[in-house]
């Protein structure tokens, strides 16, 4: 993966955390999250899936997803307390870049 793709992936992760922080306290569907990310340009489903796997994976757990097996974009997603800490910059993750940095 080239450096530009790596940077784009890190920025998308930061954007997802930021958007979920804006809606903290409310579970939203991945469809809605994708719409919130429109300002970042067209987000491909595959890139969003990779981002969700990264942010919700073992050792991270910044987000939680209640998976809808029939339509993954209809799954519910929300920020965990660890995700709030990341959004508030109480903790750092080298794999996440926030747009304001």
Where are these regions (language model features)?
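Short alpha-helical segments that sit at the start of domains
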Residues: 1-27
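A short glycine/serine-rich beta->alpha loop
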Residues: 3, 69-70
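Short acidic, hydrophobic short linear motifs in intrinsically disordered regions
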Residues: 26-39
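Short amphipathic alpha-helical interaction segments
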Residues: 42-58, 74
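A short, conserved structural fragment
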Residues: 56-69
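Short, amphipathic alpha-helical interaction segments positioned at domain boundaries
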Residues: 74-101
């Amino acid at each position: 993966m080239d450096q530009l793709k790596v940077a784009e992936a890190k920025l998308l992760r930061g954007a997802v955390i930021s958007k979920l922080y804006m809606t903290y306290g409310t579970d939203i569907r991945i469809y809605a999250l994708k719409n919130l990310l429109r300002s970042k340009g067209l987000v491909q489903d595959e890139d969003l899936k990779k981002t969700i796997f990264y942010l919700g994976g073992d050792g991270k757990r910044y987000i939680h997803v209640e998976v809808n097996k029939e339509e993954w974009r209809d799954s519910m997603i929300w920020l965990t307390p660890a995700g709030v800490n990341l959004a508030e910059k109480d903790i750092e993750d080298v794999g996440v870049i926030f747009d304001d940095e």
